[in-house]
A protein has these predicted regions:
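Acidic/glycine-enriched edge-of-secondary-structure segments
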Residues: 4-19
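Short, compositionally biased "basic patch" segments
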Residues: 1-8, 77-83
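C-terminal structural segments of small proteins and small subunits
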Residues: 56, 60-85
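Intrinsic-disorder/low-complexity, polar/charged segments enriched in Ser/Thr/Lys/Arg/Asp/Glu/Gln
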Residues: 8-10, 37-41, 73-75
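Charged, low-complexity, helix/coiled-coil-prone segments
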Residues: 1-2, 35, 71
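Amphipathic, hydrophobic secondary-structure cores in small proteins
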Residues: 15-67
Length: 85
């Protein structure tokens, strides 16, 4: 079963090739402009960004729905959540 086919992607962002802190800030900014429960498709580099960016997004209250290998990196599907609900 391919669960990605059931999820609607509302926005997409590619932060591969930039410093992980900058990538996280760009992802956070993108999510701030989205509505609750919308899904961000986020492309990140393997390695350290794969451990730090999802952790930081979860700490912000967002939900990582999918983490899978993609061309030259990793594809995440992130559901926007709010810590204050």
């Amino acid at each position: 079963m391919d669960s990605t086919q059931k999820l609607q992607v509302d926005s997409s962002l590619d932060v591969r090739g930039i410093p992980r802190a900058t990538g996280f800030l760009k992802a956070r900014e993108q999510l701030q402009g989205m509505l609750e429960n919308q899904v961000l498709e986020l492309h990140i580099d393997e390695g350290e960004p794969l451990t730090t960016i999802p952790f930081a997004l979860r700490a912000d209250g967002h939900e990582i729905l999918i983490s899978e290998p993609s061309n030259h990196g990793v594809r995440l599907l992130v559901r926007k959540r709010s810590l204050l609900t």
